[in-house]
Each structure stands twice: as C-alpha cells, then as structure tokens.
Swiss-Prot record:
Coiled coil: none
Gene Ontology BP term (one): threonine biosynthetic process
Single GO molecular function: ATP binding
CDD domains to which the protein is assigned, alphabetical: HomoserineK_II (cd05153)
Family annotation (SUPFAM superfamilies): Protein kinase-like (PK-like)
Name of protein: Homoserine kinase
Pfam families: APH
Gene coding for it: thrB
Keywords in alphabetical order: Amino-acid biosynthesis, ATP-binding, Kinase, Nucleotide-binding, Threonine biosynthesis, Transferase
Gene3D superfamilies: 3.90.1200.10, Phosphorylase Kinase, domain 1
Superkingdom per UniProt: Bacteria
C-alpha cells in the first residue's frame, strides 16, 4: 500500500455522499507498499480502507478482484469486503482514479517473521486456493512469465546503476527460468502477493489476508513459491528451512502437493524471485520524487534468486 494521489477533504466528502457509511472523522495515508494509493478512513459509521487504483492495475480487472474477495469471504476466508454505494456499485471515480472502499480488518502484520507465523500462512494459502476453485471468472497473470521479458527490457540499460553486472545476471536467469518453466501444473486463482504485510495476526492467530490486486489465475504452486520467497528468508539473505518446512506443512495439511508440483518447486521459486526483482527494479528506477511510497531494494530478491538457482530439488525448501 502507498499514496500516489492526494485526496482533498472536499473530494472525500463528495465521494462519501454516495454511501451510507457516515461522514469522515479521520483520514490518513498509508505509506507501506508500492502499487495503489491507500488511506485509513474513519467515519461516523466505522473504520474502512479507501483505495485509489494506480499504475499496473487495469481498471477492467477491478470487478474481478472485488468479486473474488466477496467470493472468498463467503467461503470462510477473512479478507476485506467491498462496500457498495447507494447505487449498488463498489467502484466509482475519485480524483481521476477508480476507487473503492473496503472494510477494515483488525490485526497487525508481523514485522519480524517467526516460525510460528509460517504454518498458518501455509494453511490459509491452501484454504484460499480451495475456496477460489468455484469462482468462475478467470484473469491472466499479467506479471507471469510472459510479462518478465518486457520488464527486463525496460530496465536492463539502467540495472547496473543498482549493482555492476546486474542486467546481464538477470538476463541469464530469465533465459534459464523461461526454458524450464512448467506448463501443466494444477491451476486456479492465486493471491500472487502473499507477503507479511498482507497477512494480519491478532493475539498470535492469523486474522486476515489483504491486498488481492495481483490475484490471477495461474499455477497454484507458483503462489507457494511466492510465499516461500516472502516469508522464509532472513535479513542476511539466508533461506530458513525451518520456516519453509512449517509453511509447506501448513499448506499440505489442507491441500496435498502433487509430485509434479514438488519437482517444479525450485524453478517456481526462481521465477517468483525474478518477478519481484524485476518489479522492484522498475519501481526503484521509476518512482516519482516525493511520492509517499516505500521503495524496496531489488537486490533482496536477486540474493533470493541466486539461492534458488542453486537449489537441487524441493528438499532444499524443507519439503
């Protein structure tokens, strides 16, 4: 989450007039994240999140995202629910951006990931996959393998500003990953961004999952690879196999991985690390000055990528 578009008090008041949730009492931007403009909104009717959609989000995809959240919540996944206006619509325009209000989930995300967090994260990811199985609409993963070559092409000429030789290293990794990428794994709807700041805990229990705006239809095990990258590396870039094992056990307790998924885990993790290295590289080089957004170091994911390229099999992840 982040803030790129500033919302005036007058614009907010006019926007809220379309809803039955009261008038604004407090309103503040959220600096964490990199994609959309997000605000915590307190009204006389309760607490909410206001999101203005920016950058990579295609407005045509927004009904799919909001529909998925409603679908998952109806099947027991605790996630934000879109708030519909008096006209029954969840989407409308604000300050030149498509915008929506969702409910506020209690809890905090873990600033320091512990092993105890990882098992419930694996569980909720598997539950999410199962709950989404009967959501009929599909959405192409725009940041899947087909999206990586154009991203690298945009950034390669400046990649060495981050680290000498980085452009060539990423190109070699991309060529290797695309050659080995599996095409026949079990597929469904994936979260695709299950980072610690998108998972809330309350009283040491997982209390909710947020930020479905990268969700797509893709290989389910790719979502696991994203989660392993996000939850199971230490600050010194070392993979924590104890955390990885806990996450994988949690997932397998709900949905058992196939042998093909297990065999593909190293290349899926390579692809996941490459995807986030590339998007972070793009954002690092292109974030507008003064934006209320936290830039994230692409090298964190380059280090992860190097680990995955050396991983011989799924056993390296604790499976």
């Amino acid at each position: 989450m982040a803030v790129y578009t500033e919302v005036t008090d007058e614009a907010l008041a006019a926007f809220l007039a379309e809803y039955d949730i009261g008038t604004a009492v407090a309103f503040r931007g959220i600096a964490e994240g990199v994609e959309n403009s997000n605000y915590v909104l307190r009204t006389t009717g309760g607490d909410y999140i206001l999101t203005l959609y920016e950058k990579r989000v295609d407005p045509n995809d927004l009904p799919w995202f909001l529909g998925l959240m409603e679908h998952l919540a109806a099947r027991g996944i605790t996630c934000p629910q879109p708030v519909r206006g008096r006209d029954g619509q969840a989407l409308r325009m604000l300050c030149g951006r498509h915008a929506a209000i969702t409910g506020f989930l209690p809890g905090v995300w873990p600033r320091k990931v512990q092993v105890a967090h990882c098992h419930p994260v694996g569980e909720v990811l598997a539950k999410l996959h199962e709950a989404g199985a009967d959501y009929a609409p599909t959405r192409l993963n725009a940041l899947g393998p087909e999206g990586w070559p154009p991203l690298l092409a945009i950034c390669r000429s400046r990649a060495d500003e981050i680290s000498p030789g980085l452009g060539e290293e990423l190109q070699k990794a991309l060529d290797r990953v695309l050659t080995a990428w599996p095409s026949d794994l079990p597929a469904g709807h994936i979260h695709a961004d299950l980072f610690p700041d998108n998972v809330f805990f309350l009283d040491d229990r997982l209390s909710g999952v947020i930020d479905f705006y990268f969700a797509a239809t893709d290989a389910l095990a790719y979502d696991i690879a994203i989660a392993l990258n996000a939850w199971c590396f230490e600050s010194d870039h070392a993979y924590n196999i104890t955390k990885g094992s806990a996450l994988l056990r949690g997932y397998n307790a709900i949905r058992t991985l196939t042998e093909a998924e297990k065999a593909a885990l190293p290349v899926l993790c390579q692809g996941a690390a490459l995807r986030f290295a590339l998007t972070r590289l793009f954002d690092w080089l292109n974030t507008p000055p003064g934006a209320m957004v936290t830039r994230k170091d692409p090298m964190d994911y380059v280090h992860r990528l190097r680990f995955h390229l050396s991983a011989p099999n799924a056993g390296a992840y604790g499976l």
